[in-house]
Amino acid sequence: MMLLGISLCATAQEGLRINEVFEGKVIDKQCMQESLVKGENLAPYNLKVLHTVKLAANDEVRAKVDNLFNEDMKERISDDDSNMELESRDGFIYYAIVQLTDSKARTHRYICYQCKEKSNYYDITLVYMEGKASLADLRKTFKKK
């Protein structure tokens, strides 16, 4: 059962560059807070997978995560702004939610990024979501804080 959980964790955001962060290749997993929710608990939100990592980053790690996220943004559904929200400052992302191309029929994939500047580090949260929820649904459910 434990191996199955590890396997699901590794494949939820398979094929995405930010998977390097989730796998602990950018910063040690012991330095991150991670949560993975799957199944019926997400049914009210029309989601199947919600995978989140939160980490404290220095300038170098922030730049790496930002670059990986930007690479994944190239896989969004279209070039118009209807499938994403993006807020950036000084060339770095501070908030983003992006709908990616569908991985399976009638299943949407989303990546989210939030970076809060602290006194001597950056508080970064990355989220991967998968399910039938539309971007409009997610905007209602997870209002930007």
Residue ranges: model-predicted function:
Residues E75-F142:
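Surface-exposed, polar helix/loop patches in the mature regions of secreted/periplasmic/lumenal proteins
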Residues K54-R89:
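Long, charged/polar, surface-exposed segments that mediate recognition or autoinhibition
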Residues C9, C31, C112-C115:
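Generic recognition of cysteine residues
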Residues M1-E20:
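Bacterial Sec-dependent N-terminal signal peptides
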Residues V65, F142-K145:
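Generic alpha-helical propensity signal that fires on short helical segments
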Residues G15-D66:
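Early exported N-terminus immediately downstream of N-terminal targeting peptides
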Residues I18-F22, I77, K143:
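Terminal interaction module
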